[in-house]
Amino acid sequence: MDTHDNIITFNHVRFKYNSDEPLALNDVSFGIPKGKWTSIVGHNGSGKSTIAKLMVGIEKPSDGHIYFRNQCINQQNLSDLRQHIGIVFQNPENQFVGSTVAFDVAFGLENNSVSYDDMQRIVPKALEDVEMLDRADYEPQSLSGGQKQRVAIAGVLALNTDVIILDEATSMLDPAGRKELISLIHRLKEEKEVTIISITHDLTEAAEADYLVVLNDGEVYQTGKPHDVFNDGDGLTEIGLDLPFSIRMARTLLGSTDFITYEGLVKKI
């Protein structure tokens, strides 16, 4: 399978959690373009979080192969893989171990035997990248939801990973926090050239991505750019996904079924 343009590739992957259970993923094949933002979307139980676990090696395929930088992932190279892929979960509090924001970001570096002098340089830069340097001495528990997510992302950036997986990272945020995090994702992708993978059921968030992978009941339903995927609006609705607000409003106000961003909708009305 040609994986040249993808940093991660799933090739006919099947997975089940227990031998007597049905497949959680069935013959799943797709690629994650390097340096882009890919959003993996689907309703609850579609297999999104299972894919995230497979990407970071928490689980391994029952059948098929997963490639990272054209190299098939196996037990021999799994530890190396984990140095290149970081994950931020829905509730970052479950990841916090430090008494302060700075100490929490430094924790992963310490586990990787990074010297104290290097940590003194890396931690402030990572916090600056997510606009949290002024909160370095705060207790993580005192932060807002959006700020906690930024600190969790800083911890991943400090490790100089190539891929950041955001597993439902915006689902517990208010609209302002969600908007700020999405803006940060765009900036990190452009300035740091990292590959972003967001796991979500929110198509309004997914519309911000460069590329989409749509799952339905453990299988790939559709892949492509948002413009192409959302033009199949009726199909997405049939598999239990709510179309982005801008598209729903365009249908109601303009009678249009074409993909349109929120900014584009405002201009038309």
From Swiss-Prot:
Q: What is its EC number?
A: 7.-.-.-
Question: Which keywords does the record carry?
Answer: ATP-binding, Cell membrane, Membrane, Nucleotide-binding, Translocase, Transport
Any idea which positions bind ATP?
G42, H43, N44, G45, S46, G47, K48, S49
Identify the domain of life: Bacteria
SMART domains, per this entry? AAA
**Which InterPro entries does the protein's record reference?**
AAA+_ATPase, ABC_transporter-like_ATP-bd, ABC_transporter-like_CS, ABC_transpr_CbiO/EcfA_su, ECF_ABC_transporter_ATP-bd, EcfA_1, P-loop_NTPase
Q: Return the protein name.
A: Energy-coupling factor transporter ATP-binding protein EcfA1
How this chain sits in the membrane, per its record, is: Peripheral membrane protein
Lineage here is: Bacteria, Bacillati, Bacillota, Bacilli, Bacillales
Its GO CC terms?
ATP-binding cassette (ABC) transporter complex
- Outline the extent of the ABC transporter domain: 8-242
Assembly information from the UniProt record: Forms a stable energy-coupling factor (ECF) transporter complex composed of 2 membrane-embedded substrate-binding proteins (S component), 2 ATP-binding proteins (A component) and 2 transmembrane proteins (T component).
Q: GO molecular function of the protein, one example?
A: ATPase-coupled transmembrane transporter activity
So what family is this one in?
A: Belongs to the ABC transporter superfamily. Energy-coupling factor EcfA family.
Read off the NCBIfam families from this record: ECF_ATPase_1 (TIGR04520), PRK13648.1 (NF010167)
**Is this entry keyworded Ubl conjugation?**
no
Known SUPFAM superfamilies for this protein? P-loop containing nucleoside triphosphate hydrolases (SSF52540)
The record's section on PROSITE patterns has: ABC_TRANSPORTER_1, ABC_TRANSPORTER_2, CBIO
Q: What does this protein do?
A: ATP-binding (A) component of a common energy-coupling factor (ECF) ABC-transporter complex. Unlike classic ABC transporters this ECF transporter provides the energy necessary to transport a number of different substrates.
The record's subcellular locations are: Cell membrane
